[in-house]
Every structure is written in C-alpha cells, then in structure tokens.
C-alpha cells in the first residue's frame, strides 16, 4: 500500500505570510502611538506617552523583521513597490524618532512622529502585493545604494520638520497671553532649533548623495538623466534645503525663518514622494 504524504506550505509562502502578519502587528502597536498623539493634541497635555513609546519601539522591531522577511521572500531590496516604499518610509521615520528621543529625550516629538509612522504603515498595508514584478531596470546594485540614501535622508528631514514645527508652536505660546497647557511640555526654543539643525545636517548630505547616485544610475542605464517629475521635484526640494544650509551658515539664520524654510522643504519631500507618482516615469511605484 502506498501512503500519500501531504506536502505542507512552500517555505516562500510561509515567509510571505509571516512578513505580512508582522507588519500588521507593528501597525497595531503603532496605533497606540497614534492614539497618544490624538489624545495629547485634544487634551493639550501629555497623555499615555510611556505606553505609546514602548508600543512604538516594539512595533519598530517587528517592522524591521517584516522588511527582512519581505526581502527574503522577493529576493531583492524591497523598495520598488508602493507597499514596500511606504513600509520602509514608516520604519525609518520610527528609527529617526527613536534616535532623536534617545539623544534629546523630547517626548513632544512623538506627537508629530507617531501619526506619520502609523499612516505610512497603514497605507503600506492597503497596497500589499504578494507577487510583485520588478522591472529589469531596477535589477541593479545601484538600487542598494541610491534608494536607501534617499529614504534615510527623508527620515532625517522629517525630524527636522517636526522640530521646526515645535519651535513655531513654542514661540507662539511664549508670546501668547493665554498659552495652552501643552506648551509647558514642549522643549525650549534653543533645543528645538538645535534638533532641527542637526537633523538637517544629517538629512541634506544623505539626499545629496542619493541624488548623485541616482544620476550615475540613470547615466549607466539611459545615458542621460531620467526626465520625470520625481527628478524635477527632488532637485527643487534639494535647492530649498541648500538655501536653508546657506542661510544658516552664512547669514546666521536661526529660529523662525529657518523653521519656516525647513517646513517648506519637507512639504517638497512629501510632494516628491507622494504626488509625483501620478505623473508616470521611471520612479513610478507599481
């Protein structure tokens, strides 16, 4: 008598299921951080920060594990699909916050960071593709250099944006005759400005190197720079940050002016990352 053995799930299928489950668990933990941000904004005072910090920290660990399993599943750096890009951005935003918090202990930064982390990860879940087809042009070692540099730069510039926003809120509160209670929780103007500047000092070189490696990649593939919306907006955003660096170092800009320009720069980052996807071109996420 022949006994038929039922084969179990394929290893790739198990890995794919695990990485999705881990990402959803991370999303659930990030929601605790998101709830903290909403409650703090509504109550105008710190609400459940420590549980939110623990949840987001645990979520980040699960998120990284999910990205590693995704890479094992698809066998390339998972940054070419919308699902992968949003997931990676969310993870790096979490990393940026955790590093900034470890150095500065600025709890109010969470009010700005946690919503972005949650939203990016939530959107990633909406675009999940179990069997992506990577274009041949992306099967290049440049993918492992150009794209992480850009995303790391984006994460650092997000922290600069959050610090600049805190600066403006704190400045307004100090001048107000009836400041809200939340202002007492904010760091000093000097700390906000210092965090914004140091984050800019990290983010600007990263996106500069990212743009340079992207140009070299385009030269190797097409012989010219790719002419698409993302290239244009990346360059315009880079110019904004170049002006910010210039005015800080040469003209001595500090405080409000630098904060406003930092916010304008990050709006450019969001337009580059989100908006230009609808214009087509080599950088369009599938």
PLM regions: where:
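Low-complexity, intrinsically disordered or signal/transmembrane-proximal segments
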Residues: 5-6
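Juxtamembrane inter-helical linkers in multi-pass membrane proteins
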Residues: 174-190
């Amino acid at each position: 008598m022949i006994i038929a053995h039922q084969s179990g799930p394929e290893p790739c299928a198990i890995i794919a299921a695990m990485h999705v489950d881990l990402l959803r668990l991370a999303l659930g933990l990030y929601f605790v951080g998101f709830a903290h941000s909403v409650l703090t904004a509504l109550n105008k005072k710190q609400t459940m920060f420590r549980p939110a910090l623990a949840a987001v920290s645990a979520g980040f660990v699960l998120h990284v594990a999910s990205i590693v399993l995704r890479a094992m599943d698809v066998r390339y750096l998972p940054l070419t699909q919308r699902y992968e890009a949003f997931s990676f951005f969310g993870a790096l935003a979490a990393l940026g916050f955790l590093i900034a918090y470890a150095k500065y202990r600025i709890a109010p930064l969470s009010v700005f960071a946690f919503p972005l982390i949650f939203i990016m990860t939530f959107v990633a879940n909406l675009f999940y593709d179990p069997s992506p087809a990577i274009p041949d042009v992306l099967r290049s070692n440049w993918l492992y250099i150009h794209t992480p540099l850009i995303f790391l730069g984006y994460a650092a510039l997000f922290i600069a944006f959050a610090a600049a926003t805190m600066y403006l809120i704190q400045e307004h509160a100090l001048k107000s005759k009836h400041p809200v209670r939340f202002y007492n929780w904010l760091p000093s103007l000097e700390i906000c400005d210092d965090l914004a500047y140091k984050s800019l000092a990290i983010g600007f070189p990263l996106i500069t190197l990212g743009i340079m490696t992207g140009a070299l990649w385009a030269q190797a593939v097409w012989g010219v720079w790719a002419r698409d919306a993302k290239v244009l907006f990346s360059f315009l955003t880079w110019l904004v940050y170049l002006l910010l660096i210039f005015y800080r170092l040469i003209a001595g800009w500090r405080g409000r002016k630098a904060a406003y320009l930092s916010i304008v720069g990050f709006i450019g980052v969001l337009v580059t990352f989100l908006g230009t996807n609808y214009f087509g071109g080599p950088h369009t996420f599938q």
